[in-house]
Structures are given as structure tokens and as C-alpha cells.
Amino acid sequence: MEKFKYKYLIKCGTNLFNRIGTCEVHSQIISEVLVRSSFCGHDSHGLQRFTEYKKLFEDKKISANGKITKKIVDNRMFVNGGNNWGIVVANEVINELIDLSNKHSICSALIKNCNHIGRLGEYISKPAMQKKICLAFVNSYDSNRKKVVPWLGVEGKLTPTPIGFGCPSGYKWPLMIDITTSAMPEGKIRDYMFNNKRLPEKCIVDKYGKFTNDPNKLYDDSNGAILPLGGIFGHKGYALTILIEILAGGLTSSGYVNEKNNKQGNGVFFIIIDIEKFINYEEFIYRTKSFIKYIKKTKTRENDKVLLPGEPEHNLFMQNKKNGIKISKRVLKNLEEVNFFI
């Protein structure tokens, strides 16, 4: 199977979005984020999203010329994304929030009217590379994406909500936690479907509440749903989902998943903490590296190796950037149908 190079795929993606009416700069930003996700091993937020984003744009769910407005009050930034590309909005906001954090110990940004922002790791890593800690909470206020069951339920009422944490590690890679509070991200389940694979046990249920490992059950007329994170302790993942809905849906005024507003996108809540305003940075890094070394010395099973959150993505990205990546037949076919390749 053919392997595709990093810069080539970014060029193809930039051309696709530019061709449908997005400016060159924004087209490249979106393309870089999506391609980087696949090269980090997260296809659920990678190449498969090109065709999805194109359709959203053509269905007028995204406004490439939507005005992004910001209001800064002390250490808080209030953002209206103007229904613009979510990746463009989030990228712009995180960069400006980093600048704002140079003046404040802790600062935050609340974003509404923002389309899908892609992989959280893209944003939480930036402050982490600049001596800062970042927290991120994202909800989806699209009532059509209610695919996650509340604890003990069998009916999709919630959406897969991610939570993120980025922090300097003292190594070439930042510590990064980017997880969804459902058993699996919806996009990851789509990956299994595209590759004709069975899901791990007890990730989704059918409309009768019975466990199934058939990913198609989430998308066909059977009205399947994803279980909350945690397995038999799923009440914990469910509780985190409620927390994220409150912060990213309520506090930002984006709206909760039950509000039928005929919109599609994300409510986003970013927090950046300037480490140097709390503790000497070198001391923080020294102690953090010592902690990481302590974790890495854990005894393991044969051929296993303890890694820290964010380390696998860094290693895989460097490997894939050198060698290129393969694209599944289903995603490749979808990309060819929209004339992605140049």
C-alpha cells in the first residue's frame, strides 16, 4: 500500500479548502491540523475529516467569512466564532491567550458559535511548549450527535465530550492528556467501521441496551449509543461529561446538547496557567523530569514500556513524518471522490 508524505498531504488539503472558497492562510491552518492528527495516530480527527468538513461548508454549516469577535476583560477572553472554521477560531484564540497569559497568572477564553475544532492536543500543546499549563473543555451543541448514554441509561442523550491538559515535561514532547469522556470517541468508532473491524467489548450498545461490537450499529437505523468512559465504573466518565457540559456549554453560553438550536459545533473553554508566576520554572521542570523518570522505571510485562501521556503521539509523529503514512481504502476512496490529491 502506498505511503503518503506529510507536506504533500498538507498541500493537497490546503488546495481543497482554497478551491471551495477558503482563503489560503486559513486553508493551510486547517489542513495542517488535520494531517498532523493522522500523523500522530489519531485518524478519527485526521484525514477522514477533510470530506466531512467540505460537506459542512457546502451545506452552509460553516461560514469561511464569518466574523470572529473577541472581547477581553482583565484575564478573560470572550469569543464569538461567527460560525467560522472551528480550527481557525481555536488556533487564533489559543495564540492570543498565550500572549494574554504573559500578563496574568491565570487566564481563560470562552468560545461560542464555533465549528468543530479538531483534536484538542493541537491546542493544549502550544502553551505547554511556552512554559505554561493549559486546560481545555469542549462540548458539542449539535442535538443530532446525541450518541452517548448517561450512566445506567440505554438511550443516547449526550455527546462525546473531550477534556485536555498540556504541560511542559522538560523533554522534546509536552505532557498531554486528550481524552473523551465516552468509552471511545465517535470518530474512532467510525475508523473501525471504515476498516471493517469489530469494536472492543462493551463500548457501545444497540437500541435495546445490549452490548455490541459492531460499529455499524452506531450509524444505522438501530439507534445505538456509546457508553460512558469507565466500564463498570462508568459513573465517573458520566460525571466528567456533565462537568464539561457545564463549563463548555453553560459557562460559554454556547448551549447544552438538549437545546434545539439547529446549529452544529463546539463550545470551548480554555484555561492557561503561567508556571513562572507560581514557582521557579527550572525548579518545576527539575521536579517534573524526576517524576517522569520515576514513572518510567516501573516494572512491566515482557516487551512493554511505560510511556507518559503525549509521548506516544510525539514518537509516532516523528516516525510517520520521516516515512509517510498509509491511508485506509475507505478514506482513500472518499478523498479521491472530492479530488483531494494533486
Residue spans for each PLM region:
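Phosphate/diphosphate-binding glycine-rich loops and adjacent basic-rich segments that engage nucleotide
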Residues: S143-L218
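Secondary-shell segments that build the walls of catalytic and ion/ligand-binding clefts
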Residues: F194-N258
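Glycine-rich phosphate/pyrophosphate-binding loops
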Residues: K131-K147, I244-N262
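Catalytic-core signal marking the mid-to-C-terminal active-site face
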Residues: F4, L9, R19, I246, ...
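A generic, well-ordered mixed alpha/beta core segment in the N-terminal half of proteins
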Residues: M77-G170, I179
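Acidic, glycine/proline-rich low-complexity segments that act as flexible tails and inter-domain linkers
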Residues: M1-F4, C12-I29, V35, D43-K61, ...
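Active-site cofactor/substrate anionic-group-binding motifs, chiefly glycine-
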Residues: G46-I98
